[in-house]
A protein has these predicted regions:
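Glycine-rich phosphate-binding loop of ATP-dependent small-molecule kinases
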Residues: 1-560
Length: 560
């Protein structure tokens, strides 16, 4: 793709530039405010050569835009030493955090513009080079200037994993109401050398160009081939590349401004069309209400949302024997004596394994979903009791806050991950989208349809990072749940555990059961299957959870 960029275009004169650029910026400023009001998010990625002027192009835009609705994320240098250390450890963990975590963390809300100065493509290319060559400076074969040594197969594999993650990230943003604009600032080898040497010679800017960057100038041809392949493989219809001639900053500024104006105009037009369609649909679905029939039932529950038809399949590899609620054996139990002995033994083993896990820098994520009063909290306590308090975090999932609602659903979980070597325990999770939000009608049918594979993509990223991911469904029969509800209601010490919402959810058992079965079917992947904890006997469920965690750590090569 880079050969499409004409680097020999004549420079634009100052007068023509000012007139054209000023008009574009005026339009862009207006569109930014409209996007802010309509909650249209804009993600703007600047990739390109070192010294191509990415930072300057962003600065020129930031000078004119509303700073209250813009942010800039500067992607730091790839840490080769960290990558080598994790690779040498031999546990398939790629770093302290997943590849895409920093970019999710920096994502602004809908209605804002988020600029990325370098981003996921730079990191993907650097990871691939590091995997192939053990660093960012390819070693050339002696006597062959155009040939480099390295593990090309490993590089292609790493690049493939990264590009798959990138595609899901960009697709998810677009599906969630963001516009994604990607610029690659291209300059010639001579132009790059001249700029970097000029920066290095100026005491004011010399700090921006270290020795390693200057050394990489000699890798231009090899880096060109990597960039070109990367651009070809990621020129998605929903997030295409705009190639920019970086040799002329005036021409570059005009192309960038034109592209952003077109992107926001297109996004706002789609938003208006979607709002009109939604309003028309709502108007056509309104039914006359009889004076004798209240809109809400006596207990205050709202009218049920229409039945949702889940997708038939997934883009991801699903296991053939996904669990079902019908297959649960509710009679499984342990005697108090068996429970006491096994609990003590397993907790000791987990404590020792967790210490080894920390030293090996393996992240562990244990996620709990289940019926109200199924015993999630008590199960979590017995797991946490086995761990060093400094090594784990329990992440609850209450109703989302206003900032969380202004971001994609998974943003609140991408920003709540355990560091490599630590444990994250999730008391309810990202599956709320396909459970409570589905049953209560909080999410649109379109977003629900997309949610299953968005979750699968998220979990694939976690597993590719090297995390041990365990997904527990804590199951209890309706009869046992009713007994526990009544016990809580009659016991002053436990009354805080039972709410009106619990009773309302119980009344919606058929809707939740259908949602759960669809969840099992569409998110029981080969890399992150569901595990049912039969919890009519809480003792049995607690021991099974501990057994499962211990086995997973041992399967990862750890020993106690």
């Amino acid at each position: 793709m880079l050969d499409q960029v004409n680097l020999n275009q004549p420079d634009i004169d100052k007068g023509t530039y000012k007139e054209t650029h000023d008009a574009l910026i005026e339009r862009l400023v207006t569109l930014q405010q409209q996007a802010r009001l309509q909650s249209v998010g804009l993600v703007v990625l600047f990739e390109g050569w070192n010294g191509a002027g990415k930072g300057s192009r962003i600065s020129d835009l930031m000078f004119n835009l509303d700073a209250r609705a813009t942010s800039v994320h500067v992607t730091g240098d790839f840490d080769v030493d960290e990558a080598r250390a994790f690779s040498d450890a031999g546990h398939n963990v790629t770093g302290y955090w997943p590849f895409m975590q920093q970019f999710w963390q920096a994502l602004g809300p809908r209605g804002a513009i988020t600029f990325y100065d370098r981003g996921w493509y730079s990191v993907a290319a650097e990871r691939a080079m590091c995997r192939a060559f053990g660093g960012l400076n390819p070693k050339r074969k002696e006597g062959k200037k155009d040939t480099v040594r390295g593990d090309q197969l490993a590089a292609r594999k790493e690049a493939g994993v990264c590009l798959a993650s990138i595609r899901e990230f960009e697709r998810g943003l677009v599906d969630d109401g963001y516009e994604v604009v990607k610029f690659f600032i291209h300059v010639s080898a001579e132009g790059q050398r001249e700029r970097l040497e000029r920066l290095a010679a100026d005491p004011t800017t010399a700090w921006r160009v270290d020795k390693k960057r200057l050394e990489r100038i000699g890798n231009y041809e090899y880096a060109y081939s990597i960039y070109d392949l990367m651009l070809e493989g990621s020129n998605f219809a929903f997030a295409p590349w705009t190639l920019v001639n970086g040799e002329d900053k005036r021409r570059a500024n005009i192309v960038i401004a034109q592209t952003l104006v077109r992107a926001l105009e297109s996004a706002l037009a789609r938003k208006e069309a979607a709002n009109s369609a939604s309003a028309a649909s709502a108007a056509s679905s309104v039914e006359p209400v009889s004076p004798e029939v209240p809109v809400n039932s006596a207990d205050g529950a709202a009218k049920q949302p229409p039945r949702f038809a889940a997708p038939a399949t997934s883009r991801f590899h699903l296991i053939d024997d996904a669990p079902t609620l019908a297959g649960v054996d509710h009679s499984l139990s342990l005697s108090p004596e068996e429970y006491k002995d096994e609990l003590k033994s397993l907790q000791k083993r987990l404590f020792r394994l967790e210490s080894n896990m920390y030293q090996a820098r393996i992240p562990l994520m244990v996620m709990y979903e289940g019926w109200d009063a199924a015993g999630k909290g008590g199960n979590i306590k017995r797991v946490a009791q086995s761990l060093d308090a400094r090594a784990y975090t329990i992440f609850p999932s209450p109703a989302p806050t206003a900032p969380e609602l202004a971001h994609p659903h998974l943003w609140r979980y991408w920003t709540r991950l355990p560091k490599a070597g630590h444990v994250g325990i999730y008391d309810r999770s990202w599956y709320g989208r396909v459970l409570v939000e589905r049953v209560e009608g909080y999410a649109s049918p379109e977003r629900l349809t997309q949610a299953y594979d968005e979750i699968n993509a998220f979990e694939k990223d976690l597993v590719d990072w090297g995390a041990i991911l365990l997904k527990f469904w804590v199951e209890v029969s309706p009869d046992e749940q009713l007994r526990r509800f009544e016990e809580r209601q009659s016991n002053p010490a436990k009354q805080w555990k039972i709410t009106d919402d619990d009773w309302r959810n119980r009344e919606k058992y058929p809707q939740y059961k259908e949602a759960i079965e669809d969840m099992f079917r569409l998110t029981s992947t080969s890399f992150a299957p569901w595990i049912i904890l039969e919890s009519d006997d809480k003792r049995y469920a607690r021991v099974k959870a501990l057994r499962t965690i211990v086995a997973a750590l041992e399967d990862a090569g750890l020993s106690d």
